[in-house]
Amino acid sequence: MFMINIACLIIPILLAVAFLTLVERKTLGYMQVRKGPNIVGPHGLLQPIADAVKLFTKEPLRPLTSSKLLFTVAPTLALTLALTMWLPLPMPHSLINLNLGVLFILAISSLAVYSILWSGWASNSKYALIGALRAVAQTVSYEVTLAIILLSVLLMSGSFTLTNLITTQEHMWLIIPTWPLAMMWFISTLAETNRAPFDLTEGESELVSGFNVEYAAGPFALFFLAEYANIMMMNALTTLLFLGALHTPLVPGIYTANFVLKTLILTIMFLWIRASYPRFRYDQLMHLLWKNFLPLTLAMLMWHVSSPMSLASIPPQT
């Protein structure tokens, strides 16, 4: 029974990821005044299936000089961790209700760095290694602000459980009192998922394809799926934190529809940003974090910790 529950979680995520690639190609196409995929199936709707068949039936080539074990394990680990992060999300029939769900998500997203590092190192290629080092530095740096913003928001809900956030936002979305944090969070999620304008790990102009340059066929598809699963996960988390989904116990379907709609809108914003902005320079990316976001988020955290004590003379609720 538990395996059926896991399958019911994983299969829809993988399907959503497959069609997200189609939505991205269509969106970018229309924004660049062209059609996008329109040959395979009606209006190109079967394009993701054709891509999957092509990638998984090709021979996965491996460079002779690469490290065999790590080269194979890295893409599998990337997808496994990307899917594991979905477990504590409060769905109508969630698999697991963790008391420390937020910490679990933070820990797993930190582990995801290893798959990128291993893939770049095991490829034994200069391009892949530079891409991997960039990705690791970028991801680890932006994790700092993500953690601080999470702490600031959780001080308002008073618990590390994700279901508590829904109860907290019954009357007002948390994006209203914490809009500066929400803006910094959204930009940090862009950097955390290595998306434009922070996609320096796969800078085509200088690194060909970044850390996955030596991967082909199935393993490449696994990295691709992991990246898009992470994007949707981060947007689902943003919805939970700042745009609390409407919840009525009598009609659980409303919660699901509300949650999915907001996540979709945020995901389309990711695609819109990709179509609109050029890539940042690496030093600008790091300056944005260490010189702008970090001092601001620390100041906001101190504000969230001190305001209950100063205004109501009560200690912060945990």
UniProtKB/Swiss-Prot annotation:
Keywords: Electron transport, Membrane, Mitochondrion, Mitochondrion inner membrane, NAD, Respiratory chain, Translocase, Transmembrane, Transmembrane helix, Transport, Ubiquinone. The chain crosses the membrane at residues 2-22, 69-89, 100-120, 146-166, 171-191, 231-251, 253-273, 285-305. This is NADH-ubiquinone oxidoreductase chain 1. Belongs to the complex I subunit 1 family. PROSITE patterns: COMPLEX1_ND1_1, COMPLEX1_ND1_2. It is an enzyme of class 7 (translocase). InterPro entries: NADH_UbQ_OxRdtase_su1/FPO, NADH_UbQ_OxRdtase_su1_CS. It catalyses: a ubiquinone + NADH + 5 H(+)(in) = a ubiquinol + NAD(+) + 4 H(+)(out). The keyword Electron transport applies. PANTHER family: NADH DEHYDROGENASE SUBUNIT 1 (PTHR11432), NADH-UBIQUINONE OXIDOREDUCTASE CHAIN 1 (PTHR11432:SF3). It is a multi-pass membrane protein. It is found in: Mitochondrion inner membrane. It holds the Pfam family NADHdh. The gene is MT-ND1. GO terms for cellular component: mitochondrial inner membrane. Core subunit of the mitochondrial membrane respiratory chain NADH dehydrogenase (Complex I) which catalyzes electron transfer from NADH through the respiratory chain, using ubiquinone as an electron acceptor. Essential for the catalytic activity and assembly of complex I. GO terms for biological process: mitochondrial electron transport, NADH to ubiquinone; mitochondrial respiratory chain complex I assembly. Its EC number is 7.1.1.2. Core subunit of respiratory chain NADH dehydrogenase (Complex I) which is composed of 45 different subunits. One of its GO terms (molecular function) is NADH dehydrogenase (ubiquinone) activity.
